[in-house]
């Protein structure tokens, strides 16, 4: 199981563990504002906040483990095997593949309040990125600089 922690002094720090014995080839990844994000269920997004984080890049797509956007909103996908369950696509919901959740959210939201509103109609699906990268069993930690305890 992965863990995460925050620390606020005059600045805001966010850290996490990645509890794997090996690397997928993850690297520090920057996604600029106008990078054309394609999603499995949503329309492509051409205008969005810039993102920086740790990701495994597959087929020119950043599969973020954790990241923050230029507004200070951060998210991490933490391993939670046996406790995270995702379903199939649901009609009437905003469907988001688990592998796309972090960039999908950080591209659109500048704060936790914005994220809460956006997430009210979201269905995270078990749709894999591709045949060799199935949906991971994660829970997500969402943080924002002004939401940290003083």
Question: What residues fall within each predicted segment?
Answer:
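Generic beta-strand structural signal
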Residues: 71-73, 102-103, 136-140
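Conserved small/polar residues in nucleotide/adenosyl-binding loops
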Residues: 144-150
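Compact, glycine/acidic-enriched structural inserts
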Residues: 35-36, 89-122
């Amino acid at each position: 199981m992965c863990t995460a922690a925050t620390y606020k002094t005059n600045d805001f720090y966010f850290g996490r563990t990645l509890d794997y014995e090996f690397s997928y080839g993850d690297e520090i990844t920057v996604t600029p504002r106008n990078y054309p994000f394609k999603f499995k269920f949503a329309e492509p997004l051409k205008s969005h906040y810039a993102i920086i984080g740790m990701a495994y890049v597959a087929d020119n797509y950043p599969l973020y483990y954790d990241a923050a956007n230029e507004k200070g909103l951060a998210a991490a996908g933490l391993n939670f095997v046996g406790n995270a369950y995702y379903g199939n696509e649901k009609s009437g919901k905003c469907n988001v593949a688990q592998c796309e959740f972090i960039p999908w959210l950080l591209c659109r939201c500048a704060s936790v309040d914005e994220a809460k509103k956006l997430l009210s109609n979201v269905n995270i699906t078990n749709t894999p990125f591709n045949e060799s990268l199935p949906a991971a069993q994660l829970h997500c930690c969402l943080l924002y600089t002004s939401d940290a305890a003083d």
